[in-house]
């Protein structure tokens, strides 16, 4: 984490900022991204936004792999396989999440679902390359990580175009793997309703209880965060957040969106852990 902070500070200095500006990192990244979105050729260039985001991703990846290696003692290929399962699984269902979250998140972020070429291409390439490295260990999965990675790469190339028609095409490409999978396995889109099928997914009542508790606990936690920060509604939060950013008074530690995002990520991690506990995602399966 210290190395990551030093790298981010260095990148800020290299691009004309001060190291102390790291406390306003969100505002800086938002401004840089808005400037880049106005210039089509700038979207092709690797900039400060990409450098900092990749520093954060690599730091989190390093922590993940180190923790797994030290605590579990798995072989490196098993770690890569687990990483591919988690990454491709999230990428597979991301379009559905975009669809359900669109009415809410659109109020906070104009660029949603994310149509950034670097975002889509990098995730697609990582998923594809990692899947090729450990493909034999992924044969028992009921989805194909290579297929998911391929469509994300295709969506990345299409996202270079800013026309509204192409934005719709990007979403269709992202949801294509799930649509193709649902032809073979109708319960793929809503696997909770699945009892027996060729998808090799078994969800019993105990897991349904865990899932329900997880969803309600997450919603309660989000409501608690809004209450703690003194907001009565998401609309009020959105207006005050935008005003703070414009006035230069934005503080990421006091931003409920950051805390809500961490709650969602933690919930996703607990959901994956529930799958692993039931043996759906495990080193033995891989």
UniProtKB/Swiss-Prot annotation:
Q: Does the keyword rRNA-binding apply?
A: no
- Gene Ontology CC entries for this record: plasma membrane
Keywords in alphabetical order, please.
Cell membrane, Membrane, Transmembrane, Transmembrane helix
Q: Identify its membrane topology class.
A: Multi-pass membrane protein
Superkingdom: Archaea
Its subcellular locations are: Cell membrane
Question: What are the TM regions of this chain, as residue ranges?
Answer: 52-74, 79-101, 142-161, 168-190, 203-225, 257-276
Which protein is depicted? Uncharacterized protein AF_2133
Organism from which the protein derives: Archaeoglobus fulgidus (strain ATCC 49558 / DSM 4304 / JCM 9628 / NBRC 100126 / VC-16)
